Amino acid sequence: MDKRVIRTKRTIKETLVKLLQKTQFEHITVKTICDEACTSRITFYNYYSDKYALVEEMFEDYMNEALADYYALQKENNKEKDDIKGYNNMLTAIINLVTNNRDFFEHTGTASNPYLYSGFYNYIYNCVMTYINHHHDNVKPKYPINQIVTLMCNGLWGIIAESFSANTDFAELKKNIFGLYNDILRSGLFERTQPNLVG
């Protein structure tokens, strides 16, 4: 991709994040984005059909960032492809993504920006669903996978949102999430073919 295109698209995305600090997504217009970014609407529409297409690409960027982090973690500390370590690496990648891009994600709550919440939730949901479907040799959900994934994703997002509100320290946030989710993996919600894997 042309460097000028990359630079322009990055500016547009950064501008939307900046606008979210003071304005709900539903009240942000393409004109507002362009005015703030010093970009013409013609340029904007060269790349995006509307602001929703812009956000969709941002979600894809974020998910690619998280997946790259996940695969790097797997290569670094889970060459044996242990299911539990894989779950933890997936959680780490999601937490890293959200904390590294806090200016965006702290404005994706159900109350402030429901469209952004539902959009990104669907990406996370599909990611976790795919993981569980492909990595449940040793840890198998006892109940329907879609219900387990809904519980895990809503819970994770709720904890992160609450942590943002309370300005929870990153290390403490990570510790609490890992403790909670490893307890869930030990619980009766999952059937373990090798009981000692979680520890």
Model-inferred region functions:
Residues 19-53, 61:
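Helix-turn-helix
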Residues 133, 154, 162-199:
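C-terminal peripheral helix-coil segments that are non-catalytic and often amphipathic
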Residues 92-121, 161:
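Amphipathic alpha-helical segments used for helix-helix packing
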